[in-house]
Amino acid sequence: MPYMSKNYAIKTGKDNTAITGFSMGGRESLYIGFSRSDLFGYIGAMCPAPVLTTDLITESDLKFTENYSYLLMISAGSNDQIVWSTPSGYHDTLNKNSVEHVWHYVTDGDHGSNTIRPHIYNFVHSIFKA
């Protein structure tokens, strides 16, 4: 983020900063977003991959330590044969932890563009309101 501030005219602060990713990037966007909730006001995950080690992301990590407004969106496809039900597991954990979030389930969506496109569309439109 310092590179962006140095080289581009950008707005700073978590109200102007988002992170989202697909598959392994989706898992990492959740990890980074929750770990650095002071930097990101918008967190998205498209078909997020499972955690490969038990200590990388725990259930207790999937909650915010402070009370603030944010957007958290997780998208999943009903026909995803790569991450299977992993996104649903994140969704269930967020519910268990009473973390408000948008659960975007794409009927007939797979681990590809027919799930990615709707996520990007809805995520960006939720952030940048006209």
Language-model features: where?
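Non-catalytic cap/lid and distal C-terminal segments of serine-dependent acyl enzymes
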Residues: 1-130
